[in-house]
Amino acid sequence: MTTCIFNQRRAGLLVHLSSVPGTHGIGDLGPGAFQVANWIAASGSTLWQMLPIGPVGRGDSPYSATSSFAIEPLFLSLEILAREKLIAPSALRAPIELAHKKTNYAKARAFKWPRFHQAFANFVAMSA
């Protein structure tokens, strides 16, 4: 018999992925997300609640997602793509303005999208 998580009190934290520490203009599912998850666990909390993570629409609001099934591509981790050898480690070097603590969707897009295209091209080439 499985235990329902709602049968007992739990504590957690609300942290949107865009707020996770990162160096590419926006938080993502890379090392920063693992740091947050580990910090939540170390604090004795058992839940990580996120705002919607769908592809953002006008105004870059998580509540204006253009799909309820997809994920915002900016939440993909360049570090993991490099670890999987889909992009070169040198592609991780970001301009200093992306390291600021405030999320900047436009600058993150300008930096990450060309790397996503390169990762896809490398994936296709490796799969052929």
Question: How would you name each of these model-derived features?
Answer:
Residues 2-128:
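Acidic/aromatic-lined carbohydrate-recognition and catalytic surfaces
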